[in-house]
């Protein structure tokens, strides 16, 4: 299989969304590796404003200078197929459409995830398959840099949730030899895979420490409230414009219906409550071991009771979020529940009652939140093997295991955690990071994004973090701001 880009194999499409139209040249479903495990997934599509080919420009960018916007569709560590500009899997106009309007080249690469199996029934989507595939896609672009539209030295990755974690990995593990055996296995090009910048919405990352971080935040709240997606049966038909055509989502290329959400409410068992306390007590030790500091040089630490400068730092960022809303003229205090934890004086957000704020947000997951002692989480499946569906990935949950589960190798866990590579001089890091974790997002602890941002900043990497007001677990909700950020670092 050739990895040469065929610039003559394209179509010109007119795409209209929300009253706006873009004409783009599309190069679709191009294999980016020579030996794919799931051929219908391990491919990419390229979308280019057609005006570039007429010698024109948009927003100061042309065919050769345009940044390459590289979103992924990974969620829950499931497979993430290519997604054309237009509608996303929820039926909303996606970031790729607006990126074209802003003058970017869009590259949408599919990637394997949990649930993918080959003809022999082997699990081929376990870690580190997803990040390996995305790296292979970057290498394909570099392999064809003389033919590919856009600037391959200005690749900006973007993702949400597990996709945000993948974006953070792309930005922290560039060209690292740890991934080389996996890249060779799928026949990736022998090229660089570092990227220029990474946009990470609510990254579900630092998985081997996510349980302790979650309980630091939510310990003491024993009732949980969430909504889960009820997946349709394999092979069940769908006329949904996106999900109905997503290859490999069910692991076998089956057609999928639009997602339906089912509420789940309950109370943790006494055993889970005890585990919550244990995990909570372990977080300060982990946080202090990182030796983090803020932009003023103040050490970020926690006392044994979970309070300290790190908590104050998180609260300070939450106050910035509230202040942004107040400055925009929004009456955020009209909600009596907000008034229970946020104090505003003379138009200034001055303090947050942390415990009341956490109670306002509510707990979403039982303890342990990610490495369940009885397994069954998306992350347990992520760390499976070709013939074992799921495994533990923390010593704590292995010690408290209730189902006789095995534990993943440390190397497999390391490959999925950007924290291990930020200080590694061999890894080429992105120059810029943008991290957004909604103020009411409960899928992982606020601490996870804060720790990632502090670690990046301590390494001298330009990092922009915020907790947008009222935003739950979501991404791409502030595209004008995202694109302003991209323009600010690319022009």
Question: What are the roles of these predicted feature ranges?
Answer:
Residues 201-205, 209-362:
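Non-catalytic, alpha-helical, charged scaffold/linker segments
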Residues 71-131, 171-173, 471:
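Cap/lid segment of the alpha/beta-hydrolase catalytic domain
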Residues 1-62:
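Catalytic-loop region of hydrolases
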Residues 44-46, 58-77, 81-82:
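Short beta-strand element of the alpha/beta-hydrolase
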Residues 143-223, 413:
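Primarily recognizes the serine-hydrolase "nucleophile elbow" in alpha/beta-hydrolase
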Residues 124-147:
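Alpha/beta-hydrolase active-site loop
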Residues 56-57, 79-85, 117-121, 152-153, ...:
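Short, solvent-exposed loop/turn and secondary-structure capping segments
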Residues 316-491:
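C-terminal subdomain of alpha/beta-hydrolase-fold enzymes, centered on the catalytic histidine
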């Amino acid at each position: 299989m050739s990895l040469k880009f065929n610039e003559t194999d394209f179509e010109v499409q007119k795409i209209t969304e929300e009253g706006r139209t873009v004409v783009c040249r599309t190069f679709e479903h191009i294999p980016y590796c020579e030996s794919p495990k799931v051929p219908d997934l391990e491919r990419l599509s390229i979308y280019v404003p057609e005006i570039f080919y007429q010698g024109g420009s948009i927003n100061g960018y042309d065919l050769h200078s345009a940044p390459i916007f590289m979103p992924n569709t990974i969620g829950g560590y499931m497979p993430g197929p290519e997604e054309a500009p237009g509608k996303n899997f929820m039926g909303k106009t996606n970031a790729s459409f607006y990126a074209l309007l802003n003058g970017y080249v869009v590259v949408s690469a599919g990637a394997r995830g949990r649930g993918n199996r080959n003809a022999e029934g082997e699990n081929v989507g376990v870690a580190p398959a997803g990040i390996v595939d995305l790296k292979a896609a970057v290498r394909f672009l570099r392999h064809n840099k003389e033919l590919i539209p856009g600037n391959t030295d200005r690749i900006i990755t973007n993702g949400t949730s597990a996709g945000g974690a993948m974006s953070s990995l792309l930005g922290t593990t560039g060209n690292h030899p740890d991934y080389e055996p996996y890249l060779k296995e799928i026949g990736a090009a022998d090229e660089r895979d570092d990227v220029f910048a990474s946009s990470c919405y609510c990254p579900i990352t630092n998985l081997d420490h996510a349980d302790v971080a979650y309980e630091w935040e939510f310990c003491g709240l024993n009732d949980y409230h969430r909504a889960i997606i009820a997946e349709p049966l394999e092979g069940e038909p769908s006329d949904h414009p996106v999900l109905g055509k997503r290859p490999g989502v069910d692991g076998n290329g089956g057609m999928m219906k639009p997602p339906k959400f089912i509420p789940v409410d309950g109370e943790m068992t006494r055993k889970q409550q005890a585990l919550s306390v244990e995990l909570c007590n372990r977080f300060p030790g982990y946080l202090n071991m990182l030796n983090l500091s803020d932009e003023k040089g103040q050490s970020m630490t926690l006392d044994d009771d979970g309070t300290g400068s790190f908590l104050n730092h998180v609260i300070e960022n939450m106050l910035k979020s509230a202040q942004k809303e107040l400055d925009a003229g929004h009456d955020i205090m009209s909600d009596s529940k907000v008034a229970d934890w946020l104090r505003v004086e003379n138009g200034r957000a001055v303090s947050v009652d942390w415990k009341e704020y956490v109670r306002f947000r509510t707990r979403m997951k039982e303890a342990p939140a990610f490495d369940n002692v009885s397994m069954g989480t998306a992350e347990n499946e992520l760390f499976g093997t070709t013939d074992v569906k799921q495994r533990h990935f923390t010593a704590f949950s292995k010690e408290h295991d209730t189902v006789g589960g095995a534990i993943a190798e440390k190397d497999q866990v390391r490959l999925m955690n950007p924290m291990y590579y930020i200080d590694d001089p061999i890894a080429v890091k992105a120059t810029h990071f943008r991290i957004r974790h909604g103020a009411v997002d409960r899928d992982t602890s606020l601490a996870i994004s804060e720790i990632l941002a502090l670690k990046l900043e301590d390494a001298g990497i330009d990092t922009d973090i915020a907790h947008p007001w009222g935003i739950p677990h979501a991404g791409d909700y502030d595209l004008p701001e995202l694109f302003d950020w991209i323009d600010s670092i690319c022009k």
